[in-house]
Amino acid sequence: MGVFTHEMEVTSPIPPEKAFKVFVLDYDTLFPKVVPHAIKSVEVLQGDGGPGTIKKINFAEGMGIKYVKHQVHVLDKDNRYYNFSVIEGDVLSEKLEKISDENKFDPAPNGGTIVKITTKFHTVGDAEFKEDEIKQVIQSRARVFKAVEDYVVANPDA
């Protein structure tokens, strides 16, 4: 198994506590509401949201994938840290065993947030995972992130 790592930082005008709440704690209800063209629904299959929880994210038609299952490994509200893996779904294909994701929400100097994201693509055997394939996954996530961020900025009580 090979591991391809992609690291990035995303800035947001939303303060860290609110950003963590929006993008992690309220994900299950907020994302299907704000981006129904991308995320159709989120089902908690097992657990209470903390470590060990398994969620099924169902995507809207036209997204290119039907669903993924996430397994939560760490949910640290005090330090605004979230770690999960995609353990099932057609995004994994025959090349990927899993995708693991670490997200840390840190204060930015302007009062907003710097989200540090480390994504690890765990390949099956010697399978190659090309940079273009990584970019597609990251760009799709970035579009959804931006749409939700815009909604929260326009609706601060969300």
Where do the protein language model's features map onto the residues?
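Hydrophobic/aromatic beta-strand elements that line small-molecule binding cavities or substrate pockets
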Residues: M8-V10, V68-V74, K98-P107
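Hydrophobic ligand-binding cavity/cleft-lining segments
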Residues: M1-G50
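Beta-strand/loop substructures that line and gate deep hydrophobic ligand-binding cavities in soluble
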Residues: N83-S140
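Structural signal for hydrophobic/aromatic residues that build the beta-strand cores
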Residues: A19, F23, K55-I57, V72, ...
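C-terminal helix/juxtamembrane-tail motif
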Residues: M1-G2, D106, D132-A158
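Glycine-rich portal/gate segments that line the openings of hydrophobic small-molecule binding cavities
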Residues: Y27-L30, K40-E94, N155
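Intrinsic-disorder/low-complexity, polar/charged segments enriched in Ser/Thr/Lys/Arg/Asp/Glu/Gln
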Residues: V3-E9, I39, I54, Y67, ...
